[in-house]
């Protein structure tokens, strides 16, 4: 267990129960979720309505396999590309709640790609991971076609889990492609699915399609990372929020250790004051701690 003192795994794997905000509300865990949905959707609307940012609506597959690419009239053709993968335990959320991070990045000269994906139980987690591999191939084709100068990827929560596949797909991410990747940012992710596979709160009626046969193959913490040297020029940041559960924090800490021991340039950061949700909400604020962190990655 990542939290040996835990007496309620369902609660430890449910991030909204660990916020210190909205304590004046009858159910803070619901209030933090409602606030997240409302604020992040507002951030998305304001990009085009108030900030003069342009968006191209693209597709990499069927169903919800969509990509929105944001930029401004000042964005150069060779601008670096920042790719964001949303969370939601592979079964919730969508692109409309995934654009908080866009504004400050576009103002700093980036193009920003926000991707969506098919959700469980319409697909199993194994199928979703295969579809995400198709997305990786698509986004690298896009960068090569548009002459992008460099890439940074960030995934939040379940999106961080999906993003981990980039390190395990040498047939898609060639050595030449990996050299384009400036940084990988794993935000508040879950990387070992063994504990949560039987939790009704996270995997009701096994909508993720987990079993003894596939549990290790869908758990990045347990993978054998062998193609490490092609990532020598890429920095990896594994990030946790102070007001997330002990299980989430320790999964992130342990995942950073796993990557370092394999030879990746990986670091672990615990963000003080943030919970699982406002660490994303505040990416919309140019001078927030998390925005400064993202800005510093550019120059490290």
Curated annotation (Swiss-Prot):
The active site is at 157 (nucleophile), 244, 276. It is an enzyme of class 3 (hydrolase). Gene3D superfamilies: alpha/beta hydrolase. It comes from the Eukaryota. Disulfide bonds: none annotated. Keywords: Hydrolase, Tryptophan catabolism. One of its GO terms (molecular function) is arylformamidase activity. Its EC number is 3.5.1.9. Pathway: Amino-acid degradation; L-tryptophan degradation via kynurenine pathway; L-kynurenine from L-tryptophan: step 2/2. It catalyses: N-formyl-L-kynurenine + H2O = L-kynurenine + formate + H(+). Homodimer. Catalyzes the hydrolysis of N-formyl-L-kynurenine to L-kynurenine, the second step in the kynurenine pathway of tryptophan degradation. Required for elimination of toxic metabolites. Belongs to the kynurenine formamidase family. The main chain amide nitrogen atoms of the second glycine and its adjacent residue in the HGGXW motif define the oxyanion hole, and stabilize the oxyanion that forms during the nucleophilic attack by the catalytic serine during substrate cleavage. This is Kynurenine formamidase. It comes from Drosophila melanogaster.
């Amino acid at each position: 267990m990542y939290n040996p003192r835990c007496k309620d795994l369902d609660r430890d794997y449910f991030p909204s129960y660990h916020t210190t905000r909205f304590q004046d509300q009858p159910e803070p865990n619901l209030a933090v979720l409602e606030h997240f949905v409302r604020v992040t959707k507002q951030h998305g609307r304001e990009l085009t309505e108030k900030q003069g940012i342009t968006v191209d609506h693209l597709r990499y597959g069927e169903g919800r396999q969509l990509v929105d690419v944001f930029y401004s009239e000042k964005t150069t053709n060779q601008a670096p590309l920042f790719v964001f993968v949303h969370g939601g335990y592979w079964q919730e959320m969508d692109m409309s709640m995934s654009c908080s991070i866009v504004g400050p990045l576009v103002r700093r000269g980036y193009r920003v790609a926000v991707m969506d994906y098919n959700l469980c139980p319409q697909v199993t987690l194994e199928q979703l991971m295969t579809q995400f591999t198709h997305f990786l191939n698509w986004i690298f084709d896009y960068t090569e076609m548009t002459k992008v100068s460099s890439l940074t990827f960030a995934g939040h929560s379940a999106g961080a889990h999906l993003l981990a596949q980039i390190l395990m797909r040498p047939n898609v991410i060639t050595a030449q492609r990996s050299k384009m990747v400036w940084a990988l940012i794993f935000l508040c992710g879950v990387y070992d699915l063994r504990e949560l596979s039987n939790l009704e709160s996270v995997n009701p009626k096994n909508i993720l399609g987990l079993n003894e046969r596939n549990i290790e193959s869908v758990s990045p913490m347990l993978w054998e990372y062998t193609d490490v040297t092609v990532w020598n020029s890429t920095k990896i940041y594994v990030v946790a929020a102070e007001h997330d559960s002990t299980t989430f924090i320790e999964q992130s800490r342990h995942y950073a250790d796993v990557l370092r021991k394999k030879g990746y340039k990986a670091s672990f950061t615990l963000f003080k004051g943030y919970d699982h949700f406002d660490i994303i909400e505040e990416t919309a604020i140019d001078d927030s701690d998390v925005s400064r962190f993202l800005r510093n990655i550019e120059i490290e």
